[in-house]
Amino acid sequence: MEYAQDDTRVSVIILTSNISNNRTPAFCAGGDQTVRSSDGGYDDGSESAPRLRVLDLQIQMRRCPKPIVAVVRGYAIGGGHILHMCADLTLAGEDAVFGQVGPRMGSVDAGYGSVHLARTVGQKKAREIWFLCRYYSAQEALQMGLINAVYPNDKLEGEVGRWVRRMGMLSPTALAVAKAAINADQDGSAGISLMGGHITRLFYMSDEAKEGREAYLEGRKPEFRKIPQSKL
C-alpha cells in the first residue's frame, strides 16, 4: 500500500482477494488464530514482542490520501469485516457475507471495528452485529449502509472499473481533502492534524507562501499585502 500511495500513476487503490473456483470464496476470514499469542498480539515468530500489526494497516488505510475500494466476494468476517470497513468504499458480489465472529473465540476489536461500525450502521445495529455474531448477506449489508453496492458476481469486475474510472477523472487533491475531512471527527486530533497537513501543503503553493520564502532567501521584508489574494 505504501508503494501505491506514493506512485503518481495510481489514483485509486483496490483491496480484494484472489478467488479460486476450487475454494470457498473469501475476501478475508479474519485473524489467524493459530498464531494468536497469550501476550495480547499475533506471534508468527518474526517479532520478539507480539503486537496487533493489523492496526497499523487500518491506520494506514485511513491516512492514505487516495480512495481505497474494498471489492468483496465471499466471506468478509471478523478482521476481514473490519478491513473492508476501513476502506473508503465497499463493492460486493452477490455471494458476499459479512459479520463479526470475535466473541465466539474470545476476541474483539475495540477500535475501528466497534467505533467505526457504530458510526456507520448506528449504535443498535452495531451492538447486534457484535452481540449475536450472525452473518449478513450482501443485500442486508447494503440495506444497513455497511457497503455501497451489490452486483452479480460476473458483473462485479466491470462495475468496479466504472467506479474507479469515475474517481480517476476527479481532482486527487480534492478527494484527499474530502477523505481527511470525513475522517477527522472520528480520528480525533490525529485526523484533524492530517486535514491540517493538506491545508498546509495547499498554502505552501499560494502566492503568499512563495512571497514569504523568496523574501527570506533574498534578505528583504515580505510584501504580503500587495498580493491580490491577501484579504485577511
Name the predicted role of every residue range.
Residues 13-15, 69:
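Conserved hydrophobic packing residues within short motifs/helices of P-loop NTPase cores
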Residues 59-175:
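Crotonase-fold acyl-CoA enzyme core
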